[in-house]
From Swiss-Prot:
Pathway: Amino-acid biosynthesis; L-histidine biosynthesis; L-histidine from 5-phospho-alpha-D-ribose 1-diphosphate: step 4/9. It is an enzyme of class 5 (isomerase). It comes from Photorhabdus laumondii subsp. laumondii (strain DSM 15139 / CIP 105565 / TT01). The active site is at D14, D140. One of its GO terms (biological process) is L-histidine biosynthetic process. It comes from the Bacteria. One of its GO terms (molecular function) is 1-(5-phosphoribosyl)-5-[(5-phosphoribosylamino)methylideneamino]imidazole-4-carboxamide isomerase activity. The keyword Iron-sulfur does not apply. InterPro entries: Aldolase_TIM (IPR013785), His_biosynth (IPR006062), Isoase_HisA-like (IPR044524), Isoase_HisA-like_bact (IPR023016), RibuloseP-bd_barrel (IPR011060). GO terms for cellular component: cytoplasm. Keywords: Amino-acid biosynthesis, Cytoplasm, Histidine biosynthesis, Isomerase. The keyword RNA-binding does not apply. This is 1-(5-phosphoribosyl)-5-[(5-phosphoribosylamino)methylideneamino] imidazole-4-carboxamide isomerase 2. Its EC number is 5.3.1.16. The gene is hisA2.
Length: 258
């Protein structure tokens, strides 16, 4: 059973054009918005090491160039793995076996598949069967007039029904989901708690909350959902701009084991 004692914070390293940037600027740049939005934090390895030094046990690395078809930063992901000695999960543009093997070869503990779950379902099922707990599925969700739809290709395309996909993935044995309301990613508008509760009600696999965290209160509220299956939260924009320091986030959600 998931509990507050095991709730994890996943500080993010969002990579665009070879640089780690604030989540908001990274997301908007990959959507083709002005380059004046660039808000660099440093090299991916430098940023990951800073999060490790602040107490993180996991790092969440996002290759937004790969996710949006603009290129690959696999060499920089390898640099991150060489710089830290904590767990790393990687996502972005991992859509076939060749790319998956290349990313796993960096030594990362987990890979998140997103677009592939919709566009390459047979291979996705094979990956889940072969790699087990090393595979999580990113459910990037957009609310539409037709219900919850999945956002793919760096959140630039909407397709597929959330509940249909979740049912199929559960049958295929998916062991973990990363659930993000894409309208809240990088926006610090608070997580979509209703969405998280609905997903947890339909699967017994653990869920990581992605996107929208704006305060310590948001993190405490997410940790309270550990009883229904939320095992952690990705911390991006609020961390990157200093609104929620990582040390405070860890203390607020993991105090029972400190």
């Amino acid at each position: 059973m998931i509990s507050k004692e095991t709730f994890e914070i996943f500080p993010s390293v969002d990579i665009v054009d070879g640089i780690a940037m604030t989540s908001n600027s990274a997301i908007r740049l990959t959507r083709g918005e002005s380059s004046t939005l660039r808000r660099p934090l440093g090299t991916p390895a430098e940023v990951a090491l800073a999060w490790q030094n602040a107490g993180a046990k996991w790092i969440h690395v996002v290759d937004l160039d790969a996710a949006s078809g603009r290129g690959s930063n696999s060499h920089l992901i390898a640099d991150v793995l060489a710089a830290v000695d904590i767990n790393v999960q990687v996502c972005g543009g991992i859509r076939d076996e060749t790319i998956l093997r290349k990313v796993l070869a960096t030594g990362c503990q987990r890979v998140n598949l997103g677009t592939a779950a919709l566009e390459n379902p047979d291979w996705c099922a094979q990956a889940i069967a072969e790699y087990g707990d090393k595979i999580a599925i990113a459910l990037d969700v957009k609310s539409t007039s037709e219900g919850y739809q999945l956002a793919t290709h760096g959140w630039n395309v909407s397709k597929g029904n959330l509940w249909d996909l979740l049912e199929r993935l559960d049958k295929q044995g998916c062991q973990r989901y990363v659930v993000t309301d894409v309208e809240r990613g990088g926006m610090m508008s608070s997580p979509n708690f209703t969405l998280l509760q609905e997903v947890c009600a339909k699967t017994s696999s653990p869920v990581i909350a992605g996107g929208g965290v704006s305060s310590l209160d948001d993190l405490r509220a997410l940790a309270d959902l550990s009883t229904i299956g939320v095992e952690g939260a990705i911390l991006g924009q609020a961390l990157h701009i200093g609104k929620v320091p990582l040390e405070d986030a860890l203390a607020a959600t993991q105090s029972p084991r400190r």
